Amino acid sequence: MGEKKPEPLDFVKDFQEYLTQQTHHVNMISGSVSGDKEAEALQGAGTDGDQNGLDHPSVEVSLDENSGMLVDGFERTFDGKLKCRYCNYASKGTARLIEHIRIHTGEKPHRCHLCPFASAYERHLEAHMRSHTGEKPYKCELCSFRCSDRSNLSHHRRRKHKMVPIKGTRSSLSSKKMWGVLQKKTSNLGYSRRALINLSPPSMVVQKPDYLNDFTHEIPNIQTDSYESMAKTTPTGGLPRDPQELMVDNPLNQLSTLAGQLSSLPPENQNPASPDVVPCPDEKPFMIQQPSTQAVVSAVSASIPQSSSPTSPEPRPSHSQRNYSPVAGPSSEPSAHTSTPSIGNSQPSTPAPALPVQDPQLLHHCQHCDMYFADNILYTIHMGCHGYENPFQCNICGCKCKNKYDFACHFARGQHNQH
């Protein structure tokens, strides 16, 4: 009871001194308020507080409401965001707003110590340093492409894999669901032929230049990785039961992605006789009926979507074609096992991958070059080298060859002079 309570004036003086320091700090950052004027206002408020011995509500109101400034030196909008003093930009975080202000001031504090590069954003400097170190942390889920910047990866997905939604059409799978399935990390190489059947009709066509350019550089990886992973993960009893396991993170499933985007093309674009497009590869129902052959299952998983009814394939044109076998006409399910299917190579000079001895009926056949291969992608690229009207006319440069030997030598030399 005998102790004396501390004077509230000491607390008020300490707080006024703290406010004075913060006000000077605000003036140094923004430059919008005169430091002397604020100091005088605070001193006047301090004298009133000393005389009354009360708290300082007038000081708080002056800082928050009248001046519209905070201790960090930025104005706030009605929803509480920090506002740029040069434009109408607003941000919730101070760091983001400071980076934005550097656009107006031209300040670039983040500089590379190896070259003259400078940036206003720290993340841009981090991406630039990867060009010196060679680090490429961003990888495409659909192929072996790697890059050092996220924006380059997005550009690659749009340009190579056609991941932009088609206007005026409806895909069989929603874009969010498709992305979720494609980005699902799994170690199993599923039997994606079954998923491809449900994605698009058999009459879908693929633009030849994009198709050839997308997959030519990925052929070596497909030959080794797909067969090894299939031999370890695919059960000998048959197909996987989970449909989401059918679309996994491997280079072959970019065909499935392309098929899903082109599944609802208008009918006028589905002209198999056009020389600018490449029809779908052969759709043999026996491929689905032979799941026990693991190596062939891995190769077939990269094929373009086929008919949803494996027992009743549609008839094929009888014209000399680049992507179809001469026996690709209508056939029943039992007869498909005895017919000669068609698979080819990317070029006549490229040998077939080293595979175990297989039944010739499980290999795709090029009737022009008399070659058998078990990879459907190589077959499609190889058949694209044949001319549409003349099978021994180079489809790249237009050179007319005499026979299959002259045709093979022409591609072995690699001299494609435009005529």
Curated annotation (Swiss-Prot):
Main location: nucleus
Tissue: Expressed in brain, heart, skeletal muscle, kidney, and liver. Highly expressed in THP-1 and M-07e cell lines, which have characteristics of myeloid and early megakaryocytic cells respectively.
GO cellular component: nucleus; protein-containing complex
Family classification: Belongs to the Ikaros C2H2-type zinc-finger protein family.
Subunit text: Self-associates. Interacts with other family members; IKZF1, IKZF2, IKZF3 and IKZF4.
Domain remark text: The N-terminal zinc fingers are involved in sequence-specific DNA binding and heterotypic associations with other family members.
Protein name: Zinc finger protein Pegasus
Organism: Homo sapiens (Human)
Gene: IKZF5
